[in-house]
Amino acid sequence: SRASLVEAISRIGSVWCVWSHLVQKRYYFRLQTSRPGPMAKSDSFFIRASCDIGNNNATEWNQTNIDLGAYVDALGKSVLRIHNIAVSITDADGASPDLLADKDGAAQFQISTQSQTGLVLATNKGLVASGMVNAEETSGADGVAGNVSESYDNLPQLWTNGYLVAVETMYLSGQASTGFKEAVTVSVVMECTVESMTKDAAMALALSQQ
C-alpha cells in the first residue's frame, strides 16, 4: 500500500542518516588523531658561561666550551632551542673594565657550534650569536669609559623561533683590544628549552652545524 511504501522509505532515510553520521564522526576522529602534534618540549631553564677574552687582540684569541651533552642527543632525538641570550662584558669581578687614559677599547664575542680561531661573519653556518662593545676613556686618566656603545646584532631573540641547536658542544669566544687596562670577561646567560625531533631531522641538523 502507499502508506507502507512511505513508511519503508522513511525507515531507509533514518538508517541512512545514522550511518552517515557515524561515518563522518569516524572520519573526523581519524583526521584529528592522524595530525602530527607539536614537538614535546621542557620548561625553560638557563645555561651560563664565561670567557676571559683578554686585552690584546693582536696576539690573543680566547675560547671556552659550553657543554650541552646533558640536553642534546641527536641519536636520541633531543635538541636544544635557545630563546634568549643576555650578555655582560665586564672585568674579572663583574665591574666595568678600566681603559687606559685617552684610549679607545673594543671587545667582541661570538657563540658558535664550531670551534673558531678568530672572529667570523654572520653568514658563517656555525654562528649562533655575536656582538661587540666599543668604549672610549675621556677623563685623561686610567679608568672606566666615558663613552660606550654596544651592538648585539645577532642574538636568538631576534628570530621568530629562537635558534635550534643539535650539537653537544658550543663555543664562547672573543677578543678585546689593547685600549683596555685589564683583561675583559664576556659572560652569557641563555634561556633554553629541550625539544624532541625525529631522529633523521635531528641528525641532519647536527651535521649541518658541525
Predicted segment positions?
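Noncatalytic modules at the cell exterior or secretory-pathway interfaces
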Residues: 80-87, 162-180
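Tryptophan (W) side chains
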Residues: 16-19
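Beta-rich globular "head" domains
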Residues: 62-118, 123-124, 191
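C-terminal interaction-tip segments
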Residues: 35-58, 74-77, 179-210
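Residues marking helix boundaries in flexible regions
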Residues: 10-13, 30
